[in-house]
Design a protein with these regions (language model features):
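Short, Lys/Arg-enriched segments at the junction into DNA-binding effector domains
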Residues: 7-8, 122-178, 182
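Active-site beta3 strand of CheY-like receiver
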Residues: 49-55
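Charged docking surfaces used in two-component/phosphorelay signaling
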Residues: 20-28
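Basic, amphipathic DNA-recognition helix from helix-turn-helix-like DNA-binding domains
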Residues: 70-75, 80-138
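Receiver (REC) domain active-site loop signature in two-component systems and cognate sites
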Residues: 60
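Short hydrophobic/Thr-rich beta-strand motif most characteristic of the beta2 strand and flanking loop
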Residues: 30-37, 45
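DNA-binding patch around the recognition helix
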Residues: 134, 159, 202-204, 208-215
């Protein structure tokens, strides 16, 4: 994991007490912390602060976390930031919506600071392992480049959120192998993140929509 002194965390929640608790515990662990109380301010702060991790509440007035995540994922300089949703909602569609717009993890309230720190550390561990697997894969006119997280199809650049890219790269790197949903969840999201099997279906559908059904 990278040096915590250099890791920036943006906390976004409309409940001041939650923001203060998370800020206190993150700073105690050595992270640099910025905060925002709504989605609009979160996007502006993220552009200026350039966080490595964004803790994002789903249920916020004016602009919810899902829309905020979608906007952040469209900002090129923030495409590698980890986004962890914080929510009191347990419904399946909330989780699917979260991962559908590019979230990396999903934690329900009340949030236990120690558990949150472990989840953040786990994201960086998985990312570190993937950094060691950089390379390019070419399938007909499709070129998948992990070193730059870019996809080129017949000279046209295709942009995918991080998890969609990781899913495509993993499957392209293991051709002619059939994986179960559980195996894909383990390899892409990791065993320490609880994700519904339906999330895999959503990501595969979105990848196919963007690169074409022929692959």
């Amino acid at each position: 994991m990278a040096d915590k002194q250099k890791i920036k965390v943006l906390v976004v929640d409309d409940e001041p007490n939650i923001v203060e608790i998370l800020k206190y515990n993150l700073q105690k662990e050595g992270y640099e912390v910025a905060t925002a109380e709504d989605g609009h301010k979160a996007v502006k702060t993220a552009i200026k602060f350039q966080p490595d991790v964004i803790l994002l509440d789903i249920m916020m007035p004016n602009q919810d976390g899902v829309e905020t995540c979608l906007q952040i994922r469209q900002i090129p300089e923030l495409k590698h930031a980890f986004i962890i949703f914080l929510t009191a909602r347990l419904e399946e569609y909330s989780e699917v919506a979260a991962f559908d717009v590019g979230a990396d993890d999903y934690i329900t309230k009340p949030i236990k600071p120690r558990a949150l720190m472990s989840r953040i550390a786990a994201l960086f561990r998985r990312d570190s392992k993937k950094e060691q697997e950089k390379g390019q894969i070419k399938i007909r006119d499709l070129n998948v480049d992990r070193s730059s997280y870019t996809i080129d199809k017949a000279g046209k650049t295709i942009t995918l959120p991080k998890k969609e890219f990781e899913l495509l790269y993993f499957l392209a790197n293991n051709p002619n192998v059939v994986y179960s949903r559980d195996e894909l969840l383990h390899n892409i999201w990791g065993s320490d993140v609880f994700v519904l099997a339906r999330t895999v279906d959503v990501h595969i559908r979105k990848v196919r929509e963007k690169i074409g059904e022929e692959y």
